[in-house]
Amino acid sequence: MATATQIFLSPDHAGIARVSECPVGAIEAANHLLQTNHDEHHMFWRPVAGHNHLTHSVLTILALGGGPAELQRAFDDARDIQRPIPPVDRQVVEQLGDPEQFRSRIGQLDQYSNFLAFFSQEIATKGYRAVVDEHCFSGSRNAETLFAQLYEGLYHPVIHLAFGIEFEQPSIVAEALAQVASHDSMGIEAFLMDCEAEATQSAHSGRTLVQLFRDAEADEALRHAAEGFDDGPARVRDGVLGRTARAITALAAQFRVDPQDIEHRLAEMINCSAFITGAVQRTGKPRKIDFFHLHTVTASLSIDILVRQPWISPVVKARLVEWKARVDLVWYTATGAVQLHLPSLLNYMPTSSAGMDWAALYRAVAAVHDDGHLAKLVRALKSGEAVSNPFEKGAGETFPIQGIAWLKLAQMAYDTTVDRPIEQKWIWGIGFDENWTHVLSLESEK
């Protein structure tokens, strides 16, 4: 039985968007690897943008149908960079039961192990659903902060939480909540709260999410907001939210979700995540995928998983979808708000993946060296296809990714990353010239 400190996977909860059964020994191998990670490794392997992806990698390969060898490969590919989990300060853990003491430590990465011990105790007593609801969705001052913290760090806290909930592993939920509480801030909470205030004060424009992305693309100040910064967090914190806070808030606040329309708006958000990931390219260069955009797709699966939970209220579900789309607009702007050109995806001709269907692509992805980003993206696209499909017919540009485009984007992700070193797999800010220097022009490749 899975507990707040012990991993115990079940074939009944082996991941959504599957195309095959679990191979012999896969569940047992995954249990061992995940327990090792839980017991030995820190959630952060460096102070900034250094998230431990081992849990994501192992569980995604399990969902893709990988066996013991593929699971071990996924674990080994990212094990060397991990660092040991720090010792727990029991006095601090006791103090975390006081809301003010808890609040004073939010956003401090060095408090991860203390938060992990605290949430493990809470879950052991109350169950993970009650603890998530209390600490993220109850509306208390601290819960509002942690709700927003789910979207910090390029969505990694909500991604980790969704893995714990999807696979029904209380110990992974405890890891996620500890990450949520200890993650440093890029200013996402203030942005989201400002959006909510703006939404209550202004009329609903009725603009679709695609239209809002195109509005960002057309806004010169937003397009240039992130210029001059070297990394994603700085582009968000100091660029988009620092230089153009009023403009991005006014834009993002226009995306609103009624609790009666969650499924439609969820599908719209998922579809648009795929749209910005595949349709943003650079003229004269081979197709590539932006590292930050791909996380909008991966996190869209995470929001879908949370929306599926009957114990989460419709009001919270609406907010989860609403906030995700608003943060997507921030990240699109932080990569330069590059022109969205759907033919760049629709006209793509697969190379290494030519002729593959989803099952074949799953097998190929499970076998290649990867730190988890490719595998998570491909599974999220397969799931997104199913969620979006009922709403695509007659939707026009509101749902730009339709039919074969879902598989084609997954093939593009595989083709452009397979057998490449990590620094050459993705574009780390697709709108900035310096990030394309390692990519030969199309003329140079002829």
UniProtKB/Swiss-Prot annotation:
Q: Work out whether the entry's keyword set contains Oxidoreductase.
A: yes
Show the GO MF annotations.
questin monooxygenase (NADPH) activity
pH-activity profile: Optimum pH is 2.5.
The annotated pathway is: Secondary metabolite biosynthesis
Q: Which reaction does it catalyse?
A: questin + NADPH + O2 = demethylsulochrin + NADP(+)
What's in the keyword line of the UniProt record?
Answer: Oxidoreductase
Stated EC number for the protein is 1.14.13.43
Query: Briefly, what is this protein's role?
Result: Questin oxidase; part of the gene cluster that mediates the biosynthesis of geodin, an intermediate in the biosynthesis of other natural products. The pathway begins with the synthesis of atrochrysone thioester by the polyketide synthase (PKS) gedC. The atrochrysone carboxyl ACP thioesterase gedB then breaks the thioester bond and releases the atrochrysone carboxylic acid from gedC. The atrochrysone carboxylic acid is then converted to atrochrysone which is further transformed into emodinanthrone.
Family under the similarity heading: Belongs to the questin oxidase family.
**UniProt name for this protein:** Questin oxidase
Which organism's genome codes for this protein?
A: Aspergillus terreus (strain NIH 2624 / FGSC A1156)
Chain's gene name: gedK
